[in-house]
A protein has these predicted regions:
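Bacterial N-terminal signal peptides
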Residues: 11-22
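Low-complexity, Pro/Ser/Thr- and charge-rich linker/hinge segments at domain boundaries
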Residues: 181-204, 386-425
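Acidic, glycine-anchored loop motifs typical of Ca2+
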Residues: 523-533, 537
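Small/polar beta-strand repeat architecture
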Residues: 269-355
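Short Trp-Ser/Thr-centered turn/loop motifs at beta-strand boundaries
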Residues: 174-179, 264, 380-394
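Boundary at the C-terminal end of the N-terminal hydrophobic targeting segment
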Residues: 26-28
């Protein structure tokens, strides 16, 4: 009990920080100095922020408007965009910053004074977005834009001694800034540590020391060893040292990372410090050459080509220089196709190679520190500075799990969100209330969101695929996928995570209350009567499983989900959706998938003393199994309507059906094994064992649901010992490969070594990797596995090269504007509990509509005086991979997320870690 008050006070402090962030998002602030820190002993770092946007809001009018959805009209001294199915709502415009940092002035090293002396020899700067909004542009269309934060590095003529200093700014940009430098108090920018904390028992506790200075010597890399910084300490709230250790070099800037998922162990970056030269011609027939008058490139060098196809070509082509002449350069090893012609503005410059960090990375391992009491602590690099405060609490991972569960709650569809997890929103997608859901004859498997990808999902509501019927009143619920609002069968992976936690966790943890609704609160009160005492995790699993149970047809088949016929319209909230909404036709794969999870739920309900409810789900699972079995035995008949739609809509001809059929059959056969293993574990029936063993004894793997099949079989009452041993060895070998990859990874990651980087790979672990870690740990008890889980989650929560938490609502420095369309439309703070995808290859987010001409939000071409101060600097292709996080919602591959790829797995892993903490 003695530890309760400090924990409460920290949580209160974090809540206040969160409130201030939320308040700041609603009212513009002036151009301001956000923080003065120390980067290296002889480099001061100052963060400057442009004013943030003043948020607009959604207002309801007395009647409908004649203008179409998306039109801007004058209203009350501002502009509003018409939204909503009845056109009786306006989304009032956000107000962009009125003042931007003058970058040309801030970069003038000779104009600074420190204590009146010209001791600043160089200025380096990194400018990235931190806030965003939208409004009506001068042309009358909707315009998105960003506000920038600037990390300004001031190189000194000598190391900074402890003391009080006054900094005078060039051009009187700011009043004189007085700051005190104390290595035991001043934050060191390069300490990359958790923004959240640890439990005392955590097997692994690590932080990192890394700084990249854009345009600085040695390609911006910083070797802290050259400063003699060799020791670190842990300080308690009084400033006393409670632990000390060595600062150890972990990675060099050019250390190869063979498992980075980028196709090469090192990455090409645009070199800073020299001007790009114009490319005025290209020849691609035969040996590819470019015409570059005045170049000085040498054979064998790497170069980067940009804007080859014009202002909206925001990608880069890296290549090797072959033969050279005075005006031409032969292009070898081009990483992507070259265009037949080039446009004005195309450039070439040298490139360098480095790893994802692009700098020296030092590790501070304090795993041996076992604090005896909860409290607030900091890391100090002796002689440099300190980290942000982090909390030690026995409830730490429980709290992180609760926050992530709150993130899932904040994505529930079909109910009003009541603010219990920091976000309020009216009910959305309720048939008969604010939406009509049409039945489509397009199966999910045939759509662009399914296996075949033959039909754009948007077409599912057009005349080719409409059968004229509306879905029933029960077609509500489930999770919204992420930034958009679709509810897909894949979301059942989240339910599977929570059902498995019921098997993994000690009994006392199953009694934990996370504050989520009981099933009887929103679902059928008769069906779920007397279930309130079930574990919260079971209620959370039921939420999505029940949704798909209600999508089950009379014949037992399952629909793949519900979706809008297009991505969300900017400024339109989910509860004011104007696009057509449809439900996919049943498909065999979705039906097997549901049979597996419903059977698993029935087993758990039986174990928790709910036999009647268990029967409901077991009967539903059996009907799904039988329907899928009938379908797979005659795919021609099952998909006859869908094939007719393909032909009628011109997506395929009848001759393409055999190949399509084969792909559908392969997917269904795999998911048949998943369902059979689950149902065998639940029922013990021989027919399910036979169906499972037939494939499991072959060349099986653990990709996503296939891992479920292996795990369910291993945990069944009677098994073939050879198959079981083979599957157990598969879990162990896959995990061993994952652990081996950490030896060369700059920062820990649960990305599968063979998975390509991006879309979360290398950031939050997906459900498959989360299950792999938990299941292998259950088999082996190997603490190295939980150590990797701890390192990965701490990396997401701040121990990364940005020093930011990638989880909304957690951390002093956190992501504020993920691609969550409701908060953007409503003009409010993003809901807590979202974990974004994070890092991705620069070419993967080279969107021309973002990094293009002057009309784009982060323009790089044809710059006006305004857009000159709103572009990312330095070049996106010069910033190291782990620094290159663009906090702008429409950078989809970084700023989006899904309930099953990021939020659900992080929730499950945090709760699993909580289960490893000794009970009070």
């Amino acid at each position: 009990m003695d530890d309760v008050l400090p924990v409460f006070l920290l949580r209160l402090w974090l809540a206040i920080v969160w409130f201030l962030m939320a308040a700041g998002s609603g009212s513009a602030k002036d151009l301001r100095i956000a923080e003065v820190t120390i980067a290296t002993p002889d480099v001061i770092s100052v963060e400057i922020k442009d004013p943030n946007f003043r948020r607009g809001a959604i207002i309801e009018l007395d009647g409908s408007l004649p203008q179409p959805v998306g039109a801007w009209i004058a209203h009350g001294g501002t502009w509003g965009m018409v939204i909503g199915p009845e056109r009786r709502h306006l989304r009032l415009a956000d107000t962009p910053p009125a003042e931007l940092l003058d970058r040309a002035v801030i970069d003038q090293a000779g104009e600074y004074r420190l204590n009146g002396q010209p001791t600043i020899t160089s200025v380096y700067r990194k400018s990235l977005p931190y806030d965003s909004g939208f409004y009506q542009s001068s042309s009358g269309r909707s315009q998105t834009a960003a506000a920038m934060k600037h990390q300004v590095f001031l190189k000194l003529s000598r190391s900074l001694e402890p003391g009080t200093y006054t900094l005078s700014w060039p051009g009187d940009l700011f009043p004189e800034t007085t700051f005190n430098y104390d290595p035991s108090v001043t934050r060191a920018l390069g300490i990359r540590s958790t923004q959240a904390g640890h439990t005392p028992e955590d097997y692994s506790k690590k932080a990192y020391l890394a700084v990249w200075v854009p345009g600085g010597p040695a390609a911006g890399s910083v070797d802290f060893g050259s400063y003699g910084l060799a020791r670190f300490s842990i300080l308690d709230e009084s400033g006393s040292v409670v632990y000390s250790g060595d600062v150890k070099l972990k990675s060099l800037p050019d250390a190869k990372e063979p498992w980075n998922g980028l196709g090469s162990p090192l990455i090409d970056y645009a070199a800073l410090g020299e001007q790009a030269v114009p490319v005025i011609g290209i020849e691609t027939s035969g040996a590819a050459t470019i015409t570059v008058p005045g170049h000085d490139f040498q054979s064998g060098e790497r170069i980067v080509l940009q804007r080859l196809s014009g202002a909206e070509d925001a990608a880069a082509v890296f290549a090797t220089v072959g033969a050279v002449s005075l005006e031409t350069v032969e292009i070898l090893d081009s990483q992507s196709a070259l265009p037949p012609t080039v446009t004005q503005g195309a450039t070439a410059r040298r490139a360098i190679s480095a790893n994802r960090a692009g700098t020296y990375v030092f590790e501070m391992d304090y795993s041996n520190w076992m604090p005896t009491q909860n409290g607030r602590y900091r890391i100090r690099v002796d002689g440099l500075g300190v980290s942000d405060v982090f909390q030690v609490s026995s409830d730490h991972w429980k709290d992180i799990g609760r926050s992530a569960l709150g993130g899932l709650y904040n994505h529930r569809s079909g109910i009003a969100l009541d603010g219990r997890f920091g976000f309020e929103r009216p009910a959305a997608f309720v048939p008969g209330l604010n939406v009509e859901i049409a039945e489509s004859t397009l199966p999910l498997s045939f759509s662009s969101h399914g296996t075949l990808g033959l039909v754009p999902f948007e077409d599912a509501a057009n005349s080719t695929w409409r059968n004229g019927k509306s879905a029933g009143a029960d077609y509500w619920g489930g999770y919204m996928d992420a930034g958009d609002w679709d509810r897909h069968i894949v979301h059942l992976r989240v339910s599977r995570l929570f059902l498995d936690l019921l098997d993994y966790l000690p009994t006392d943890r199953l009694r934990t209350s996370y504050g989520i609704p009981k099933s009887s609160e929103f679902l059928d009160p008769e069906l779920y009567a007397d279930t309130d005492d079930l574990p919260d995790l079971l209620h959370e699993a039921i939420w999505t499983i029940d949704f798909f149970r209600r999508l089950q047809g009379p014949d037992g088949t399952i629909r793949g989900g519900i979706e809008s016929a297009g991505h969300p319209i900017l400024g339109t909230a989910s509860f004011l959706e104007t696009l057509p909404v449809f439900t996919y036709a049943p498909d065999i794969s979705s039906t097997y998938t549901y049979a597996a999870i419903a059977g698993s739920l029935a087993r758990h309900l039986q174990n928790y003393g709910q036999p009647d409810l268990a029967v409901v789900y077991m009967e539903s699972a059996s009907r799904a199994w039988e329907a899928a079995e009938a379908g797979i035995s005659d795919l021609d008949a099952f998909y006859a309507d869908a094939v007719a739609g393909l032909v009628a809509g011109g997506y395929s001809d009848s001759e393409g059906w055999p190949e399509i059929r084969l792909k559908l059959e392969e997917e269904a056969e795999t998911l048949r094994v998943v369902a059979a293993s689950s149902l065998y574990r639940t029922t013990g029936e021989q027919k399910f064992r036979t169906a499972a063993e037939k494939r499991l004894k072959e060349n099986w793997d653990l990709y996503l649901e296939k891992s479920d099949a292996a795990w369910d079989y291993i945990n069944s009452s009677k098994t073939d010992s050879g198959i079981r041993q083979s599957l157990e060895n598969l879990f162990k070998s896959e995990t061993a490969l994952l652990l081996e990859a950490q030896e060369t990874n700059t920062y820990p990651s649960m990305k599968h070594p063979y998975a390509p980087a991006g879309w979360g790979q290398g950031g939050p672990p997906d459900s498959g990797m989360a299950q792999l870690a938990m299941r292998t740990h259950m088999l082996t008890g190997d603490n190295a596995i939980t150590g990797l889980v701890l390192d990965t989650l701490n990396g997401l929560l701040g121990a990364n090269q940005t020093g930011m938490s990638l989880m909304t609502g957690v951390g002093t420095r956190q992501i504020l504007h993920p691609l969550h369309e409701d908060h953007r439309a409503m003009g409010v703070q993003a809901p807590p509990g979202i974990i974004i995808y994070g890092w991705a290859p620069a070419n993967a987010f080279a969107y021309g509509w973002i990094f293009g001409p002057s009309w784009s939000p982060l323009a790089e071409v044809g710059l006006t005086s305004q857009s000159q101060n709103t572009k990312v600097e330095p070049s996106r292709f010069a910033i190291p991979y782990f620094e290159n996080l663009i906090e702008f919602p429409d950078v989809i591959i970084q700023q989006e997320y899904t309930v099953h790829q990021t939020i659900g797995p992080v929730a499950a892993l945090a709760i699993y870690l909580d289960g490893q903490v000794d009970a009070d």
